[in-house]
C-alpha cells in the first residue's frame, strides 16, 4: 500500500458522502432502525458497528481512505449515520407507523465503530504487536491485542464548543486537541465563507454550546506467551470515549481498533517533554468469553470421536495414550501426568442454594526433592493452557500477585498482578516455599473465592481471579514421612487445604527404577530414537493436546450419577473417621475437590456423566496426596508410578480394594466393561 498523503482530500466530497450513505443504507438499515426504538434519554451515545471486510468489498477506495485517514473519514461516517437516522425517523413519522405514546426522543449521538475482525487489517502491518508499533503507524487505523493491566476512572472531557464572530456574527465549531492536553486553539481569522470575507479575529463563546464526553484511560499489555525469553512486555495507553467507557476492567483480554496518535508527556521540572504514543479507540472487543484463539476444525473433532470409538472396549488405555503426550521427555510419573491433566481440564463451576459460587478450577501443588521434574511440569502445563502466567516465589510479592495501586497524573489507578492477568487460565508459581508468609496469605481469597477484594488509596473494588494455581516447592530439609505436610513444607494448613491435589515426589533409592529411567534418557539421545514416536501416541502432540483440553472444557458439563455420589461420600466419611487423618487436608474442601476431580476425569474420558470409574480415579489422585492417612495401599510413590500394560484390569483390583476399605458400597467389577 503506498504511503498516504499528508492531508485527507477527495475529488468530490459530496460524491464521497453519498457512497457512505449507500453503504449504511445497504448493510445497516436494520441496525439504524433499532437505534430509533424507545429510549429514555436522547443524550445517550449509540454505537453502530460496521464490518471492515464488508466495506472493503463494497467500496475499496472508501476502505483505503478509512485506513489512511481514520479521523476524517470516521467524522464523515458519523455524519452519514446521523443523516440516515434522521431519514428513517422522518419516514416512520410520515407513515404514521408508531403507536400513540411510542414517540422517541431525537438521537443526536451515533458513532460508527469499525470491526476489523476477519478482514485484511488483521495482517502484521495493520495489526502489529504493541512492541512493534512505530512512527509509520501514526494517524492510521490500527488494531492491537493485549490484556488490560490498568484501568482509570471515568471522567468528563470537553468535546467541542461554538463561537460567534463579533463582526459578521458567523458561527463555527472548535474542537479541542486531545493530543495537547485537550487545549482549545481559536483560528487566526473568521471562518466565514462569504464572498467578501470577514477577516475578524474577535470571537465570542456561545452560551450552553459546550459539548462534553465521557472519558477513560486504560493501559493494555501485550500477551506474555507470545514473547521470547528475556523480552519485556510492552504496554500502550488507550483512550476510551462515550459508549466505550467502563466496558473493560483490569485483567480482561481485549482487541482494540483505533487511531494511533501521540501526546506530550506531563511537564516536570528539569525533565524534557517527549511525545508518548497512545491509541484513541474506535472499537473495543472483549475476548474473555472466547478464552482461546484456538481454531478447532471439524476434522480434528472427528479425530477425537474416532479415537474414543476405537477405545470403547479399553477406555483407560485410551486415556493413558493421551496422558503419555504430557511431558513425553519424562519417563513414567503416571500419577503426576494424570493430576496435571485433571487440573488443566477442571470441573464445572456451579452456584449453590445460597447463591454462593463454588469454583470449578482445581489447584495443584508439587512437593518434591530437587531433580524430580517439578519445573518441567509447570512449564509444560503453561504451554497447554490457553492463558498462563509463570512466576517464582522469590520474585513475587503480594502486590505483584494480586493488584497494585499506582498514581498516574494525580489519579490513583489499579494495575493487575499475576493472578488477575491469569484470569480464565493458569498461574504457575515455582519455588512456592520462597514466598514470604505475608505474601502467601494474600492469595487465600484468590484461590477459594476466585476474587480479590481491594481497598487501596480510596479504591474499593473486587477483581476476578478465576484461575488455576499450579505451585511447586521443595521440602524443608529431608522429608519426614511421619510428619504432616505443614511441617515438611512450612506451608500453613489453610493454604494447603485450598490445594485439591498435593503430590509428594520423593527421590528414594530404587535400583530397578534408576535403571529404567537412565535407559530412557540415554535412548532419547541415540540416533535410532530421534525422530521416532510410537504409533498410539503419535496423535497427541502439544497442539493436539491444547485443542483437546479446550474442546472438552467447552463442550462437556458432567453431572454426578448416584453411584459416583455414593463412592465419593463413602470415601470422605472414611477419611474423616481415620485416626491418622491430616486435619488440614480432610475438610469439606476435600469433598469438593473429589467432585471437581471426578468431573475433570469424566471430561478427560469424553463424556457428560460422572461414573464410579471417574470417582475412583479422583480418589486415587487424592490418595497420592494423603501421605500420612492414605487408606489404599496401592497408591504408592507418585515419583515411581508408571503406565501399566492393562490399566482397565488393574482398575478393577483397585475398585475392590477401595470397596473393602470403605465398607459402605458393593462395587460392581463390570463397571469398565459397561
From Swiss-Prot:
Motif (Arginine finger): 497-500
Record-listed ATP binding positions: 368-375
Compartment annotation: Nucleus
Organism domain of life: Eukaryota
GO cellular component, one term: nucleus
Ranges annotated as C4-type zinc finger: 165-198
Keywords per UniProt: ATP-binding, DNA damage, DNA repair, DNA-binding, Helicase, Hydrolase, Meiosis, Metal-binding, Nucleotide-binding, Nucleus, Zinc, Zinc-finger
Location, primary (coarse class): nucleus
GO process annotations (BP): double-strand break repair via homologous recombination; meiotic cell cycle
Domain named MCM: residues: 318-521
SMART domains: AAA, MCM
SUPFAM superfamilies, alphabetized: Nucleic acid-binding proteins, P-loop containing nucleoside triphosphate hydrolases
Gene3D superfamilies reported for this sequence: 2.20.28.10, mini-chromosome maintenance (MCM) complex, chain A, domain 1, Nucleic acid-binding proteins, P-loop containing nucleotide triphosphate hydrolases
Reaction(s) this enzyme catalyzes, per UniProt: ATP + H2O = ADP + phosphate + H(+)
Presence of the UniProt keyword Cell membrane in the record: no
InterPro entries: AAA+_ATPase, MCM, MCM_dom, MCM_lid, MCM_N, MCM_OB, NA-bd_OB-fold, P-loop_NTPase
EC number from the UniProt entry: 3.6.4.12
Role description: Probable DNA helicase that may play a role in DNA repair during meiosis.
Alphabetical list of PANTHER family matching this protein: DNA HELICASE MCM9 (PTHR11630:SF48), DNA REPLICATION LICENSING FACTOR MCM FAMILY MEMBER (PTHR11630)
Family, as annotated: Belongs to the MCM family.
Protein name: Probable DNA helicase MCM9
Originating organism: Oryza sativa subsp. japonica
Amino acid at each position: 500500500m503506498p504511503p498516504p498523503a499528508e492531508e485527507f482530500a477527495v475529488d468530490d466530497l459530496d460524491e464521497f458522502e453519498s457512497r457512505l450513505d449507500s453503504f449504511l443504507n445497504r448493510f445497516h438499515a436494520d441496525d439504524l432502525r433499532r437505534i430509533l426504538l424507545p429510549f429514555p434519554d436522547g443524550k445517550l451515545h449509540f454505537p453502530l458497528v460496521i464490518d471492515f471486510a464488508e466495506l472493503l468489498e463494497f467500496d475499496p477506495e472508501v476502505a483505503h481512505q478509512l485506513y489512511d485517514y481514520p479521523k476524517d473519514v470516521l467524522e464523515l461516517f458519523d455524519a452519514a449515520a446521523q443523516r440516515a437516522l434522521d431519514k428513517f425517523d422522518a419516514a416512520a413519522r410520515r407513515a404514521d407507523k408508531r403507536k400513540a405514546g411510542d414517540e422517541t426522543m431525537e438521537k443526536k449521538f451515533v458513532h460508527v465503530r469499525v470491526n476489523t475482525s476477519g478482514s485484511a487489517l488483521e495482517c502484521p502491518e495493520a495489526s502489529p504487536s504493541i512492541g512493534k508499533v512505530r512512527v509509520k503507524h501514526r494517524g492510521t487505523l490500527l488494531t492491537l491485542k493485549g490484556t488490560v493491566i490498568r484501568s482509570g476512572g471515568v471522567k468528563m472531557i470537553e468535546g467541542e464548543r461554538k463561537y460567534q464572530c463579533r463582526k459578521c456574527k458567523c458561527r463555527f465549531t472548535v474542537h479541542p486537541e486531545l493530543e495537547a492536553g485537550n487545549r482549545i486553539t481559536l483560528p487566526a481569522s473568521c471562518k466565514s465563507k462569504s464572498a467578501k470575507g470577514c477577516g475578524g479575529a474577535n470571537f465570542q463563546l456561545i452560551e450552553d454550546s459546550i459539548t462534553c464526553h465521557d472519558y477513560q484511560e486504560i493501559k493494555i499489555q501485550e500477551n506474555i506467551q507470545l514473547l521470547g525469553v528475556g523480552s519485556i512486555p510492552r504496554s500502550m495507553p488507550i483512550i476510551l470515549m462515550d459508549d466505550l467507557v467502563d466496558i473493560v476492567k483490569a485483567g480482561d483480554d481485549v482487541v482494540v481498533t483505533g487511531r494511533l496518535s501521540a501526546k506530550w508527556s506531563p511537564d516536570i521540572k528539569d525533565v524534557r517533554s517527549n511525545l508518548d504514543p497512545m491509541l484513541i479507540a474506535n472499537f473495543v472487543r472483549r475476548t474473555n468469553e472466547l478464552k482461546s484463539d484456538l481454531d478447532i476444525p471439524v476434522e480434528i473433532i472427528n479425530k477425537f470421536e474416532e479415537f474414543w470409538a476405537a477405545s470403547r472396549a479399553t477406555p483407560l488405555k485410551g486415556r493413558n495414550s493421551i496422558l503419555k503426550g504430557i511431558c513425553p521427555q519424562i519417563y513414567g510419573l503416571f500419577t503426576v501426568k494424570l493430576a496435571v491433566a485433571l487440573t488443566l481440564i477442571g470441573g464445572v463451576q456451579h452456584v449453590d442454594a445460597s447463591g454462593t459460587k463454588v469454583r470449578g478450577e482445581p489447584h495443584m501443588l508439587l512437593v518434591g526433592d530437587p531433580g524430580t521434574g517439578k519445573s518441567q511440569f509447570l512449564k509444560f502445563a503453561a504451554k497447554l493452557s490457553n492463558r498462563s502466567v509463570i512466576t517464582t516465589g522469590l520474585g513475587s510479592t503480594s502486590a505483584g500477585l494480586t493488584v497494585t495501586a499506582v498514581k498516574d497524573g494525580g489519579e490513583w489507578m489499579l494495575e493487575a498482578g499475576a493472578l488477575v492477568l491469569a484470569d480464565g487460565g493458569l498461574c504457575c508459581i515455582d519455588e512456592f516455599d520462597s514466598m514470604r508468609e505475608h505474601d502467601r496469605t494474600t492469595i487465600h481469597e484468590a484461590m477459594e473465592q476466585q476474587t480479590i477484594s481491594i481497598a487501596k488509596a480510596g479504591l474499593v473494588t473486587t477483581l476476578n481471579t478465576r484461575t488455576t494455581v499450579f505451585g511447586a516447592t521443595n521440602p524443608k530439609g529431608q522429608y519426614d514421612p511421619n510428619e504432616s505436610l505443614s511441617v515438611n513444607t512450612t506451608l500453613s494448613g489453610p493454604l494447603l487445604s485450598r490445594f485439591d491435589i498435593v503430590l509428594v515426589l520423593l527421590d528414594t533409592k530404587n535400583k530397578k527404577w534408576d535403571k529404567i529411567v537412565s535407559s530412557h534418557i540415554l535412548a532419547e539421545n541415540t540416533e535410532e530414537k530421534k525422530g521416532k514416536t510410537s504409533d498410539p501416541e503419535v496423535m497427541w502432540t502439544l497442539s493436539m493436546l491444547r485443542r483437546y483440553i479446550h474442546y472438552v472444557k467447552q463442550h462437556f458439563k458432567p453431572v454426578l450419577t448416584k453411584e459416583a455420589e455414593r463412592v465419593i461420600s463413602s470415601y470422605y466419611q472414611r477419611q474423616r473417621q481415620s485416626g491418622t487423618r491430616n486435619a488440614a487436608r480432610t475438610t469439606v474442601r476435600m469433598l469438593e475437590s473429589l467432585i471437581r476431580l471426578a468431573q475433570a476425569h469424566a471430561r478427560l474420558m469424553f463424556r457428560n456423566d460422572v461414573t464410579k470409574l471417574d470417582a475412583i480415579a479422583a480418589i486415587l489422585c487424592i490418595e497420592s496426596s494423603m501421605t500420612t492417612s492414605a487408606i489404599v495401599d496401592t497408591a504408592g510413590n507418585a515419583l515411581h508410578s508408571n503406565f501399566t500394560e492393562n490399566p482397565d484390569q488393574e482398575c478393577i483390583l483397585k475398585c475392590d480394594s477401595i470397596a473393602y476399605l470403605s465398607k459402605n458400597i458393593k462395587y460392581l467389577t463390570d463397571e469398565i466393561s459397561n
